[in-house]
Regions:
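Active-site nucleophile-His-acid catalytic modules used for acyl/amide transfer and hydrolysis
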Residues: 260-274
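Acidic, metal/ion-coordinating pockets
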Residues: 1-264
């Protein structure tokens, strides 16, 4: 089975900059990846509702409208999702045509946040993939997350990854918003097969023979779909899962913007210009 995982995060401005990035190019890549391989997972690892000039007016609705044209399989709220308060995030979550999730965010009393999911298990061509969505635990210090409670990013992520493996996941994928120091701890845990991480505003890939890792750039400038060729065999009732990663590099300067998305972008630009 060939599985493709495309991750993105830290995308704030609807328009491109110097012919690179922006939602119209991002959506073009997402649509093309899905068309090329039905076993594609498209994940968001945090930060889009703010900050941008237009978000100052619409509290991030423009980013929801644009991502709804090429919806994610799962979206993790970043700290900037709470810049306009919890109520606004709840409204934007309800307006999304994709699921938001984070295993380490609860209400003040520890009960689940309505509409916010947890670990997601997907069957991709017979491969059981567990998506572990984890938010940045420093969010309350830098954003307006009200009385929401954020459990420790690293410990919660590793515990959930190990549990997913025990529950029979063939592949464990972390979708996290956290800094590179925490990323290194997640990689060192050997609990994840793949980690898609945002927050650092940089682009990086690595593979240590156990975990394939992508730091998912900023503003959708550079994208790295990861293709995993997965071989599953069963012997004496035991499942053996083997895979190798192929990191592709896409400089979005070479991508033709998605027409539907570009029309929406042009409309938003006109609003700003007026």
């Amino acid at each position: 089975v060939k599985l493709t995982i495309l991750g993105i995060g830290d995308i704030y401005n609807f328009q491109e900059e110097k012919g690179r990035g922006g939602f119209a190019r991002l959506n073009a890549v997402a649509k093309a990846e899905r068309a090329a391989n039905p076993n594609t997972l498209y994940v968001f690892d945090g930060d889009m509702l703010s900050p941008s000039i237009l978000s100052g007016f619409d509290k991030g609705q423009n980013t929801i409208d644009l991502t709804n044209l090429a919806p994610f399989d799962i979206a993790v709220p970043g700290n900037h999702e709470f810049d306009f308060g919890v109520e606004n995030f709840m409204e934007k979550m309800a307006a999304s045509k994709f699921p938001w999730a984070a295993i380490n965010i609860t209400k003040a009393d520890g009960t689940p946040v309505e509409g916010l999911g947890g670990v997601m298990v997907k069957d991709m061509g017979g491969v059981k993939v567990a998506l572990i969505p984890v938010a940045q635990d420093t969010t309350p210090e830098v954003s307006s997350s009200g009385d929401l409670k954020f459990l420790p990013t690293v410990e919660t992520a590793i515990a959930a990854a190990k549990q997913a493996r025990d529950d029979g996941a063939d592949l464990v994928v972390g979708v996290v918003q956290t800094n590179m120091d925490n990323d290194r701890m997640l990689i060192a845990s050997k609990a994840f097969d793949v980690i898609m991480s945002g927050d650092d505003h940089s682009y990086a890939t690595s593979y240590d023979g156990i975990t394939a890792y992508v730091e998912t750039s900023i503003e959708g400038r550079y994208l790295s779909p990861v293709d995993l060729v997965i071989d599953i065999s069963e012997k004496d009732g035991k499942r053996s899962v083997k895979w190798t990663p192929n990191f592709r590099f896409i400089d979005t300067a070479s991508v033709t913007p998605d027409a539907e998305s570009q029309a929406m972008v042009d409309g938003f630009q006109k609003k700003l210009d007026d």
